[in-house]
Amino acid sequence: MFDPTDRPRVFGLPLGADFPRALVDGLIARHKDQLPETLARVTVIVNTQRMARRIRDLFDAGPPMLLPRIQVITDLGQGAVGAGIPPAVPALRRRLELSQLIGTLLEKEPDLASRAALFDLSDSLAALMDEMHGEGVSPGAISALDVSDQSGHWERTKTFISIIKKYFDGATSEPDVETRQRLVVSALAAHWASNPPKDPVIVAGSTGSRGTTMMLMQAVAKLSQGALILPGFDFDLPEDVWTKLDDPLLSEDHPQYRYRKLMLALGLRPADISNWGADIGLDVAARNRLVSLSLRPAPFTDAWLAEGPALPDIAGATQGVTLVHARHPRDEALAVALRLRQAAEDGQTAALITPDRMLTRRVTAALDQWNIAPDDSAGQPLHLSPPGRFLRHVAQLFSQKMSAELLFTLLKHPLCHSGGSRNQHLLFTRDLELYLRRTAPPYPKESDFRAWASQ
């Protein structure tokens, strides 16, 4: 599939490209004059199940052909490579273990935090553990940091982090999800080093934002038939600006920082990154140049004045870009929902990209009034799902005195008596509600129910 080369093979796709479509079109174009089975020998590793489904849907749209193997990064450990690696410990079990350790620490140092913050601290520490495992950072590396702190906060922080040391010393025997994923990638890289695959292996759509993913990308890029396809690569960024991204203190928040780190690890220059091939149009190309210039790191912001006036067709570059100043969060969500509704009416594909989960819930609620159910890639929290809400109502019966309001909220829930005789159940519920509203106190007792049932 790929011509021989003496350097790692890395491709990029610019912002504005339909990444799954460009990936599929590029694979088909590169196998146009080859035997049908050659495409089936290609392995494509992607980030998410959503990406895998979209790629399969694009292939299924035709023409008929043998498809490549499409794998999700998190599924790499399901094969022979992960056979000797212990299964991951459930996240809930790990959080409960951490809550016990934090509880013991709070007993020894009660001024560290209140007992009410126990589970919040457990969640925070578990998230930190996941990131440390993913990046390959041990508690010892954090303790060795030279942080000038006269107030003692850093010492207390190190004490807090030290309680998870045992999960790093014995991480391979009872690994969490991130640790197991890193072990799988390490084993896979070692296997490829001694038995390199002859067929093409492609990692597509990954940015290397996680340390484990970066390990996999480096291992694949060094294969004779391996390749990386980077999304949102900035082909307009000058090479002298790329060199200023080496300092993490100044540039770690830049969207191209991880790509710079990857290029340094592979010994590549920006000019070595080839365009996989995608027609993004003149307006999108102009917008990319504008965005690239606006995101220059601090030492190069003077380029705004030097290069800004030379940008062609600013009006075309910003066509379709709207700035909305919302007075309230509700107005913000409604504006987004109205635009998504318009896209649905026009038959367009639209996406809301935001880290704000409250905003997504407000937008979902606004769309619900038009019977539009968006596909949320982050999923729905269990406690907000219909079964979760029902179980929360049931749990309230054990934690507080039963009121008529709580009782009927539970009885009228769609999951309460959801069988074929639900109509009869709702009739009984209505009769009971009318009886209790007329004759019983706000907190009914067993005798009140017996009196109603005897009628």
What is the role of each PLM region?
Residues M1-Q455:
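Polyanion-engaging groove/track-forming segments
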